[in-house]
């Protein structure tokens, strides 16, 4: 199992109160494969550095999790298939 940090930028037209519950659907993939979700941090609506699909804003969410590489690959695949997700970025944080 490895630690990952996943940043997700969602469509700004979504209601910010529904972001965390909708992310839980995707995170069930991690839990079902034996991984764990340490933290879900919804930053809210932020201005983008450049437009993504005619959107100048996006709802940012950062998730810290521990899972197998194959599980994180499946999570990223499912997120990219969702129309409400503008961008994803999966990082492996450095261990200090």
From Swiss-Prot:
GO terms for cellular component: cytoplasm; ribonucleoprotein complex; ribosome. Gene3D superfamilies: 3.30.70.60. Pfam families: Ribosomal_S6. Keywords: Ribonucleoprotein, Ribosomal protein, RNA-binding, rRNA-binding. GO terms for biological process: translation. It comes from the Bacteria. Transmembrane segments: none annotated. Belongs to the bacterial ribosomal protein bS6 family. Binds together with bS18 to 16S ribosomal RNA. This is Small ribosomal subunit protein bS6. It comes from Thermobifida fusca (strain YX).
């Amino acid at each position: 199992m490895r630690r990952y940090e996943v940043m997700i930028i969602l469509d700004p037209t979504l209601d910010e109160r529904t972001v965390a519950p909708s992310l839980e659907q995707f995170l069930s993939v991690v839990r079902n494969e034996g991984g764990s979700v340490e933290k879900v941090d919804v930053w809210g609506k932020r201005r983008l550095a450049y437009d993504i699909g005619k959107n100048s804003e996006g709802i940012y969410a950062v998730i810290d999790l521990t899972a197998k590489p194959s599980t994180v690959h499946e999570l990223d695949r499912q997120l990219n298939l969702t129309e409400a997700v503008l961008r994803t970025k999966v990082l492996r944080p450095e261990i200090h």
